[in-house]
């Protein structure tokens, strides 16, 4: 939720106060459009995220209402308590763990990753292919296990993409603060196709929303929509047999 950050940014820039603005590609593009082509952006620095898509706020609020009754003290969407690859949704209430489930077992995360309730516009995003005027782009380096397995400790590794001269200035100013090494464009894209392609809607997206509008819970709706088909079960069984024979 950008709230009034566009207006605040504009006011800061008028007073020559440096601003570092981070957000999704569409939020960065929106900021530039709001400021206008003639604005003085010399003190504006922007960082975009490699974006999978933006989930529906309604579904998130409903999920919390259905599953969390106590006051929430902290939420971590990508906790590494079980490792980087099997990141975990960790919700704490009053300082104690209330929900701690991996991305493959938590229904909210499953529904998001399978594109059941990303915003409609995300399926035809106009801000792929590095087109937002961002100075830096950051994300997870999901190609790490494939290209640099010797560096993979399952604690995660980030990508930093330098997009322009201003971004290079930022990178040069901070690069001595952390371990880094260069990789190729192909290595970036291999594990991060979201840089180039929009996420396709799940085939049961309409069914999911129909169930939600009929009063079904998020957990129930996700479970029903992502239930394996007969052929998927057959395929999974064959794969297990092949692994067992090896």
What do the PLM-derived regions correspond to, one by one?
Residues 1-246:
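Iron-sulfur-associated redox domains of electron-transfer enzymes in respiratory
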């Amino acid at each position: 939720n950008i709230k009034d950050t566009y207006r605040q940014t504009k006011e800061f820039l008028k007073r020559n106060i440096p601003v570092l603005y981070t957000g999704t590609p569409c939020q960065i593009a929106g900021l530039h459009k709001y400021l206008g082509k003639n604005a003085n952006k010399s003190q504006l620095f922007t960082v975009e995220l490699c974006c999978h898509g933006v989930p529906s706020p309604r579904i998130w609020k409903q999920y919390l209402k259905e599953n969390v009754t106590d006051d929430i003290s902290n939420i971590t969407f990508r906790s590494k308590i079980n490792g980087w690859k099997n990141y975990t949704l960790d919700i704490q209430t009053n300082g104690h763990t209330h929900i701690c489930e991996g991305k493959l077992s938590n229904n909210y995360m499953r529904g998001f990753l399978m594109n059941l309730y990303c915003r409609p516009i995300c399926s035809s995003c106009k801000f792929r292919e590095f087109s937002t005027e961002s100075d830096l782009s950051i994300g997870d380096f999901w190609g790490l296990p494939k290209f640099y397995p010797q560096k993979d400790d399952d604690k995660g590794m980030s990508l930093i993409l330098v997009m322009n001269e201003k971004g290079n200035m930022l990178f040069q100013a901070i690069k001595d603060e952390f371990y880094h090494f260069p990789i190729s464009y192909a290595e970036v894209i291999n594990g991060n196709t979201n840089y180039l392609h929009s996420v396709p809607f799940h085939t049961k997206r309409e069914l999911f929303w129909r169930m939600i509008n009929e009063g079904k819970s998020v957990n129930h709706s996700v479970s029903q929509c992502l239930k394996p088909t007969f052929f998927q079960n057959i395929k999974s069984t064959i794969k297990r047999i092949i692994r067992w024979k090896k």
